[in-house]
UniProtKB/Swiss-Prot annotation:
Gene name for this UniProt entry: frr
Organism taxonomic ancestry: Bacteria, Pseudomonadati, Thermodesulfobacteriota, Desulfuromonadia, Geobacterales
UniProt GO molecular function: ribosomal large subunit binding
Protein name listed in UniProt: Ribosome-recycling factor
Keyword Cytoplasm: yes
CDD domains: RRF (cd00520)
Pfam families per UniProt: RRF
Coarse class of the protein's main subcellular location: cytoplasm
Length: 185
């Protein structure tokens, strides 16, 4: 029973960290990555489709993304969707493909991005603490129901805290890595 609670908690904490990593992939660092465009939806024949389902995305250079639509009629809707995305990118259209050149980030913009990264990391830590609280509540309920002894509860609470500490350290590690990437000129 105790192992189930701790195992379940670890799974949820792992998902929180994975969610943070996915969020960080969407952050612009001055280096081109197709994940910047993951949230862009294109009006494709009456339905909203993700950009990668209507075009081929490529990164020919460090700060350039090319978008080659499978249907040339999709160039205008793709261009419009990118302009409306608040990514601060200006698409250049040559009739067959769209080029996105990522401008270099200013020092001020880098600092703003780092502040946002820290906010996201703090939200992830709050989520981890909430998961820890839920696990401890479940353990206390087991003890109250006499399913586990007080000693087992104390041992399990220590395991929960150790696991939480290790997951918080992972969040800090992910933050530090992304922070370095953003501040790198």
């Amino acid at each position: 029973m105790v192992k189930d609670v701790i195992s379940n908690m670890n799974v949820h904490m792992g998902k929180s960290i994975e969610s943070l990593r996915k969020e960080y992939q969407k952050v612009r660092t001055g280096r081109a990555t197709t994940s910047l465009l993951d949230d862009i939806k294109i009006d494709s024949y009456g339905t909203l489709s993700p950009l990668n389902q209507v075009a081929t995305l490529a990164i020919p250079e460090a700060r350039t993304i090319t978008i080659s639509p499978w249907d040339s009629k999709m160039i205008a809707p793709i261009e419009k969707a990118i302009m409306n995305s608040n990514l601060g990118l200006n698409p250049a259209n040559d009739g067959k493909m769209i080029r996105l050149v990522l401008p270099p980030l200013t020092e001020e913009r880098r600092k703003d991005i780092v502040k946002q990264l820290k906010r996201d990391a703090e939200e992830a830590k709050v989520a981890l603490r909430n998961i820890r609280r839920d696990a401890i509540d479940q353990l206390k309920k087991l003890e109250k129901d006499k399913s586990i002894s007080e000693d087992e509860l104390k041992r399990a609470e220590k395991d929960v805290q150790d696991s939480t500490n290790s997951h918080v350290a992972k969040v800090d590690e992910v933050l530090l890595h992304k922070e370095k990437e953003v501040m790198e000129v």
